Amino acid sequence: MTKKVILILISIFLLCGCNKETIEVEEKTETRKDYYPEAVTDIYDEYVPMLNTVTKLTYFEEEYSKVLLDGINDVLIKYHKLLDNYHYYRDDNDDLIKNIKYLNDYYGNEDGLDVSDELIDILSNMKKLMKLTEGYFNPFIGELIESYGSKFSNFPVVCEDIDTDLIDKYLNETVDYNDIDKIVEIDGNHVVFHKYKDIDKLSINLGAFSKGYVAERVMEYLSNSKETILLNEGTSTIVGHSDINRTWNVGIRDPHNKYSYIFALELSNNSSLSTSGSDQNYYLLDDGTVRCHILNPYTGYSENYYSIVTVLSESAMVSDVLSTALFSIEDSELSIDIIKAVENEYNVNVDVCYVSEYDNDELIVRTTLDRDKLLNKSTSILSTEVMDK
């Protein structure tokens, strides 16, 4: 097996429930190249960053193929346009693309609309994962997230929470995962986004899903290629492809020191890693309580059970969704039940690492991985507990 060690320090932020970040400070190589896909243009000729974040492809010069990179770029553009809930786009025939934003406009319209096979697949997986995570992945809390406005920041300040009455209002309008089939009804390629209760405005936001879903589509495109590619989306959802079983070591960032890491994990061929954390994009209360961007759909606030949650799986979509959902769950039995349900449904293996803070900046790690899978562990780790699945 050929191993190319790439050290990626993962920091995390989540904007509107979705965006996450990783900083790469890797061992340099003369042949390594980075490719950044171009921004996408909406119907008003405004530039939109690919997947609304920084997307990077790492490849090796000896294996360079412009045709391959162009093909990957086409896949990224196609699914960015479908998953975007903020912008309209046109296709090659100058027709409006029926994407998530287009579907949101049909909320409460009982006639529904016909959509592409690709959007049907997106919606079907959305519904399935909402049920499997028992609503901790909830793509209908966009209004709640937006009610926080600009409080979340990479340069946090002391703020007051938003009004509790406003949070209660949005919680009362939160979609119950048991009702998802009644709200988003799929019949072949026909979709009806039914009105829920008496809620005037309801929209789908797939920020905690989209990067992983797109990464899987890219891996499908690469399935028969011989090139080695590392796809880094928003620099938290990371997947690797290699025809020669090249592996990468991915360092999980220390929440107290953005230039250091607490341990590294091996990312094998065609596997994925996704991380969520509270150490960026947050604000502080007067008493020092951290309010981060990852909101619990059942309380309307962020939780402080963990500093970091990292999920590894063959499915980038699963890793992306679970890293967000598990962040808000303290009950380890419920977390394991959800992991098992997802594993059984998607026929994948899922492992998780929880990092919690202790006194004096010491960290406690709980993981379903064997201890020897945590590489280059930091001295800031007080203890490591292996969890049974």
Model feature map: region roles:
Residues 1-16:
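Sec-dependent bacterial lipoprotein signal peptides
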Residues 2, 18-389:
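Mature catalytic core of soluble alpha/beta enzymes
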